[in-house]
Amino acid sequence: LFECVLSCDIKKNGKPCKPKGEKKCSGGWRCKINFCLKV
């Protein structure tokens, strides 16, 4: 896994990567390719 360089508005299962749709991939979120994972 790596810190997402794209904004965390990538969606998984039709829902925002982060609950409030924040643009930063901080707070435990990591993106792998186009998958958003909370770690």
UniProtKB/Swiss-Prot annotation:
Keywords: Calcium channel impairing toxin, Disulfide bond, Ion channel impairing toxin, Neurotoxin, Secreted, Toxin, Voltage-gated calcium channel impairing toxin. One of its GO terms (cellular component) is extracellular region. It comes from the Eukaryota. One of its GO terms (molecular function) is toxin activity. InterPro entries: Hwtx-2-like (IPR012625). Disulfide bonds join C4-C25, C8-C31, C17-C36. It is found in: Secreted. SUPFAM superfamilies: omega toxin-like. Expressed by the venom gland. Belongs to the neurotoxin 12 (Hwtx-2) family. 06 (TXP1) subfamily. Toxin that inhibits voltage-gated calcium channels in rat cerebellar granule cells (IC(50)<200 nM). Is lethal to cockroaches. This is Omega-theraphotoxin-Asp1a. It comes from Aphonopelma sp. The lineage of its organism: Eukaryota, Metazoa, Ecdysozoa, Arthropoda, Chelicerata.
